Amino acid sequence: GDVNQNSDIDIIFFHKIPTYKIDFILNQNNYENYRRELIMATPGDSIKLYIYLNELTAITIPLTKLYKTSLEFYDFGGKINYEKLIKNERVPGIDKRLVLITPLPKGHEERSILNNESIAAKKVGVSIDTINERKRVLLRREEHGRTGVFLKRELSLEESPEAVLTKLARENSIIRKKIN
């Protein structure tokens, strides 16, 4: 809805793919100075590989199954597929301020989701539970700042994400259960 030159871009794969394929494509396209990290926000969340191409562009690859809440997280923010992107289509989404941004033919409309949760849920196509969960997290973050994550492991470009994850699973039963 309110995409501009300084907007961040998150590219997400919704199914597991071998990470070496992404590394290969990046190398073929002369991306050399990118950062990678394994992230598991909470013990109940999926484990993902984040590849940061620059300050505004990230690629997310799930290394374990994405659950409904993880999938709806992307709808919440305004998920768009490649075909719609090529056609310059825009979709509604909710930002970190808890503002629903609805694209208009020219510009966009902004509306707080507070006390408008069911309207927001319908607009972005998620459950009311997802709206309430994201609202809880973002309001807590506003009050207390960003809290820690369960797993955050920076990777060198030489490390295989899958090999590091296997090693971490040997040391941690929660991670072990996720990858099995």
Where are these regions (language model features)?
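Catalytic core of pol beta-like nucleotidyltransferases
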Residues: 2-6, 15-180
